[in-house]
Every structure is written in C-alpha cells, then in structure tokens.
Amino acid sequence: MKSLAKLTKGVIIVAMKTLIGSAPVLAGTFVYVSNADDGDIGVYSVQTDGSLKPGEHAKAANVVMPMAVSPDRRFLYAAARSKPYSVFVYAIDPNTGALKALSVSPLAESFPYISLDKTGRYLFGASYGSNMISVNAIGEDGRVAHEPLQMIPVGRNAHSIRTDESNKFVFVCTLGSDQIFQFTFDSKTGHLASNTPAVFLTKPALGPRHFITSSDNKFVYVLSELTGTVTTFSLNSDTGLLTEVSSASGLPPESKLVPGAPRGPVGTPGGPPPRNTDNDIWAADLHLTPNGKFLYMTERTNNSLASFSVDGASGKLIFLGSTPTENQPRGFAIDPKGRFLVVSGEKSDTISAYAIDETSGAVKLIGKYPAGKGANWVEIVSFD
C-alpha cells in the first residue's frame, strides 16, 4: 500500500510539473480570421504571452470577408461576397474556440461590412456596390431571418454600419459620396428611421470608410480611406447627431502617398480606377483600446499600422508613429482587455500578433503565424 501511495504521489507531482512547464493558453481567448480566397475562417487560441496557436479552419464560401460576434459571444457571423450572397452562422465553443456551423441565410447584396445591435437580435449590412443598407432579424438560436426587415438606399459606396453604445442610434459611412448617414434605431422592432438631419456631409474627397464609438459614447472616430486621416466627432447622446471636432493623419510626415479615389466593389468587375493607384492612400480599418487611451489604423499601400493617443476629454488624437506590418493589412482587432493586437494581410501568408504597451500605446511584435489566402477580417473573443 505504501508503494502504491508513493507511486500515486509521484505521478501527481510529475503531472503538475508538466502542466506548470507547458505554455499555457490565455483562458478562453480566441482569434478568428476570414480567408477570402480559401473560403474559410481560421481559428487561433491566444497563449498567455500573446502568441497564437493555429487550430482548425471552419468552412464558409468564396470571398468570405466581414464578420461579427454576438454580444453574448455565443455566435460568430461571417458574410460571403460571392454569389449567392450569404451569411454563415457558427456557434462558438467557449472552451476550445472551435466553430460549429449552425446555418446559412441569404443576404440582399454583397456586404463589405456587417454588425449586430447591442441586443444581438438584429444584423446590419452595408453594400458598397448597391449603395444600400439592410436589417435582418436574428432568432434566439442565432439564426438570421431569410427576409430583411428593411432595405434602405443610402449614399454611394456604403462601407460600414454600426450602432452607438446606447443602441438608440445607427450611423452609416458612404465612402463615394462623402456622407455619414444618421438614423434612430428601435431595438424592439429593429426599425431604422432617418434622423434630422439625415446626413452629415464630410469634407470633399474624404472617403469615410469605417468608424468606432468611444466606450463612454461621447465621440465617434471616422477613418478616411482616401486621405488616411481619422476625424473625431462629438456625439449628442440625446439627439444622436454628430459634430466634427478635429482630424489627425495616420501617415508619417515623410510619406509620399497621395490622396486616393473610390475603387470598384469586391467580387464584381467594377469600373477601372481613374489613375494608377500604386501610390494612393488606401486606409482600411481602425480600433480603440478598451480603456479608450489609444487608437490604431491600418494603411494598405505602405503596409502600416498607425498609433494615436486619445484625449479622453476632447476626443482629439495625437499621432504617435507608424509600424510596418502585413502586406495589404485590411483588418485587425484588439483583445477585450487591450493587451494584444492581431493584424491580417490580404497579400500575406501570415498574420502578426503584437503586445500593446498600456502606458505608451507602443506595439511590439510577438510573432507571425500561418494564415490562409486573402486573410482580411479579424475578430477576437474572450471568455476569461
């Protein structure tokens, strides 16, 4: 009996040493990357040091691009921009991060951007090629209704649609017409109605593309695809209307890039650009750290990740610098605790993970990890 007890104790000690010595996974934190050319979604688990461990891929469809996660983190939504236009719904395993295919529903058009309202009951889509937005209901089981509740024409080249933090207002950036559409939103019915005024007209040739709202709902930050600037707007929480505050460039002073022009939609022939675009500014995505202290944006022509500090009182941005990153970095995401940032490149065979310095906002490369073809949209989900 004493020998058995001794043996059991030894096994336990060895097992504990093995567990302690292994590279631990950051409890329930996972990265998802849509691979447009492969037609699938890459799954990665985040280790405690911010490194990534590649996992299984989930099948989707050709030109799968924008994604969104439900507020309760139960479901991942991914839209395919190839015909038939569809949204794929997956259940997220909180223990492994694995995606289980639940359903496929038709979408009205090719959407470069999808998002959910704060209740998770409605899916919004913005169509670049058809100049419209749509709203679809979502069931308790996460499935998207086959028929949209609304289809609303907006300005040319709609590129993003999101609610504010209160879930009472919705904004739409239309890149080709230099407009930001302002809506009121009824979360009980999913109905959008034009605010008054219905449109904020930006500066000419700005090309508003993506936007993000501060967590305190005081400011909206809008990325210009064509100028590489981020414009700060104050948000009136009572009326849902925007007022321009300031603007900051995400390009270093020595940059030789020139203002860009709207391009043809993905997945369709589109019209040829008005000139050679090799030296055009082509900004892509922006995100805030959860504490609101830093903002980042990507630019696809010079393959860079720009950093800004944020003045919480005024919303004004100060350009901190630019970091080389993946080739044609269309998408990136920041983990929910603001410790790590992951960037994908449409013309890269890797994705990059960075550590974020919580004091300075500086990013430091942790590592590069295998990616699928045409990697573009990135989502990070944490269950810790």
What are these regions (language model features)?
Residues A36, R81-S82, Y128, I138, ...:
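Short loop/turn segments immediately following the C-termini of beta-strands
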Residues L26-S51:
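An edge-strand/N-cap motif at the start of beta-rich repeat modules
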Residues G55-G120:
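Blade-loop segments of beta-propeller domains
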